[in-house]
Amino acid sequence: MSQPEMPESVTDGDTPEDLLIDATDHPDGLDSELPPTAVDGSYDAGQITVLEGLEAVRKRPGMYIGSTGERGLHHCVYEIVDNSVDEAMAGYCDTIQVELLDDNWCQVTDNGRGIPVKEHPVEHIPTVTLVLTKLHAGGKFGNGGYKVSGGLHGVGSSVVNALAAHFIVEVRRDGYHWRQSFSLGEPDGPLEQLEALGPDDYEGTTVRFQPSDEIFDAIVFDYQTLSNRFREMAFLNKGLRIVLTDRRADHADEDGNPVHEDFLYKEGLKDYVRFLTGTRDVINPTIISLESHRP
């Protein structure tokens, strides 16, 4: 078998030292050998940047939500919904409503416990403000707030806030309705205490946000993308109701009504098997399902 020919620049007798570029052959430096991505200047202590708070999120959003394209845009919705799902898994929420509104707003409402509003004992600001403006501030790092959780584990809400042109949170708990608004992660003002809750009012949290068109490539939510995701969530969390409503004026159905889907699967994965089976004949009509809980 013949041996492959060696490139002209490399011969059998070359040693590693022979392959090194001789700087004397380039008295003006190695500019001719530099890649197109090369930069001018030194790399020393002065080039190290420290980004404070949510500035890092706005500077490199892809590190937190994957991209600034369609996938990252919808990931913001998932992060807010994941917080509500965590409330459901903790046993305090059974309904999540997701609404797509005009002007590229999205609203997520649950009937959970509501984000705490009292002053944080260490940071000395309302806890809801802390959760929405500080990375890694949340109830999922221990201390009994949650046994299990999803999403970015305390990062999600603050990341969405940082990437939103406008972000509004409303909390119903401790006997009152509370409200605070933000712009690109910065509070527009202090947490407001509004009207007292009535005997028929439910507790919970509502988040309404408008993604920044200066950060995302496009800020139009796709209904079908969200529908597919929330159907899967409902299958995985039996008994949890997720309602998706598209209230955008240009997305109404033939009768002019908002497009609407209601996902509720009381048998969870068993219902998922039925969904996959559809109208096809099945060999075994009884779906085998096993479940266990760790202490």
Per-region residue spans from a language model:
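A conserved short beta-strand within the histidine kinase catalytic ATPase domain
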Residues: 94-100
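Alpha-helix capping/hinge segments and adjacent helical runs
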Residues: 53-54
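Conserved ATP-binding N-box helix of the HATPase_c
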Residues: 71-94, 156-163
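Conserved short strand/loop->alpha-helix "switch" segment adjacent to the catalytic nucleotide/phosphoryl-transfer site
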Residues: 59-77
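GHKL-type ATPase core
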Residues: 2-47, 103-127, 138-266, 271-272
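Short basic (Lys/Arg) and small-residue
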Residues: 131
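Duplex nucleic acid-engaging cores and interfaces of nucleic-acid transaction enzymes
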Residues: 223, 231-235, 277-280, 287-289
